[in-house]
Amino acid sequence: MNRLTNISKIRKSLIDGKLKVNDLVLNKIKEINKVSPNHLNTFISLQDEKSLGKQIKESQERYDNGTNKRLDGIPIGVKDNFSSKNFKTTCGSKILENYIPSFDSTVVKLLKEEGAIIIGKTNMDEFSMGSSSTSGHFGKVINPWSKPNNNNNNDNDNNNNGEVLYVAGGSSGGSAAAVASNYCVASIGSDTGGSIRQPSSYCGVVGFKPSYGLISRFGLVAYASSLDTPGVLTNNVEDAAELLDILIKKDQENDSTSIEFINNNQNQNQNNGEKRNILDEFNEKLKNKNIKDLVFGIPKDYLVKELDTDILNLWKEVVEEIEKRGGKVVSVSLPHTRYALPAYYLLATSEASSNLSRFDGVRYGYRFEEEKDENKVDNDNDDDDDVDENKIGMGLKDMYTKTRTNGFGEEVKKRIILGTMALSRSSYDNFYTKAQKIRRLVSDDFKNVFQGENKVDILITPTAPSPAFKQNEKMDPIEVYVNDIMTIPSNLAGLPACSIPLKLSNSNLPISVQLISNRLTDDNLLFAAHTIMNFDCYKDFTSLTPNYLK
């Protein structure tokens, strides 16, 4: 099955008996290990053979009996910050290297209930803190569009045989690279400031972040709880719609969904407040709507100096293609976009400093253990019950300090320190409170565009200011943070956003545009994304094979 084959076509082949679940799943495993085990380092861990065999057998039996579920036998990758029962969940960190949860996250549970086969847990930046998937404890993810050498030896970022390795983006880089490489049909990621959309752009796949609160966060290891959003990475928009339809459920057992998908569109011939099925809404729009029915906004504030020429040209080209087909395009202003990046890093790190305080070596995860000196003689002649409480206190403090110092990577420690500073008494008003005010202003900017005079339906922007950069490229930390400048605003406002790959840059790397819509108009966003991806000039992109797989 190639990248062009969507879930519905795979399911039909399985129902018709033209394809067996065993062949589908084991071919994916074979591809992952084709050159050497996990060659692109997309997965941290794969499902064990016994569990995999059991799931394959059960799925095939349901197909044979005509009782198959929607995702039966479909291999799905899951980012390694979603808890999965009896399956390591590491968050890409040494501190959780051997942590095995006793429960499934709601996202994993919903996938399993529909018969999906969780083929493995995908690699990521540690605790989702990064934009390149190079900061994790389990090594760097290689972008499948990298240029391989003749010997397929990836010991160095760039070697004498002409190999050039590019980052996969982050923090869901493993998920994006796995889908682009056809190692799984689709993958699950999390998006806090662009962590689904930016790697999707770098790897040339569809990345969809839904409205905040639609998909349950229960079992998603928190980075910044008010921003973290589960989402999907696929090769086409149809698969994104199908997965979202399964995952968008009010979580009755936990409080990590805040809203239900209701009719939020005044123009629809339905009663406001009526619950909707996102897949049905998407399919209905495909039948009865076209590009002429939408108003597209072009935010001039996204025209930043860091914008790559190829991406700028693609942005202009998409606008021209929409206008050629009768779509209405207007220029809009989001004036507080310039403040979104610093506000985000203050808010996200503040929440992270609190969320990550639980990793202390006491309750679960890695604990620092000092090496015992076998030759050390205990000269303490005091009675055993004569305990020095000060020594115990210092020992516990040392254990906390050394556990977190050795268990967390440099980027995570940097962000914890920044967040702790922002929440301190002397800095709270000057930093954290101001960042919250900026968040409100950014949200109001979007509200004015979507509900203002032009009634914009969809905003079109670049996804990232540049294509993927080289793995060994020396970059100032601020330059790295700027890679999220296009994606962060929609997280601050809780809006749905989608990255769609459309063509290759002059350096043969995927480039994309981002679409953003109003809250709870996720179905409209899916329709717009599908329509643009199927313009004649773009529809062949997903048939291209990434360089590293040729």
Curated annotation (Swiss-Prot):
It catalyses: L-glutamyl-tRNA(Gln) + L-glutamine + ATP + H2O = L-glutaminyl-tRNA(Gln) + L-glutamate + ADP + phosphate + H(+). It is an enzyme of class 6 (ligase). The lineage of its organism: Eukaryota, Amoebozoa, Evosea, Eumycetozoa, Dictyostelia. PROSITE patterns: AMIDASES. It is found in: Mitochondrion. GO terms for biological process: glutaminyl-tRNAGln biosynthesis via transamidation; mitochondrial translation. The active site is at residues 79, 171, 195. GO terms for cellular component: glutamyl-tRNA(Gln) amidotransferase complex; mitochondrion. InterPro entries: Amidase (IPR000120), Amidase_CS (IPR020556), Amidase_dom (IPR023631), AS_sf (IPR036928), GatA (IPR004412). Its EC number is 6.3.5.7. Belongs to the amidase family. GatA subfamily. Subunit of the heterotrimeric GatCAB amidotransferase (AdT) complex, composed of A, B and C subunits. NCBIfam families: gatA. Pfam families: Amidase. Allows the formation of correctly charged Gln-tRNA(Gln) through the transamidation of misacylated Glu-tRNA(Gln) in the mitochondria. The reaction takes place in the presence of glutamine and ATP through an activated gamma-phospho-Glu-tRNA(Gln). One of its GO terms (molecular function) is glutaminyl-tRNA synthase (glutamine-hydrolyzing) activity. Its main location: mitochondrion. This is Glutamyl-tRNA(Gln) amidotransferase subunit A, mitochondrial.
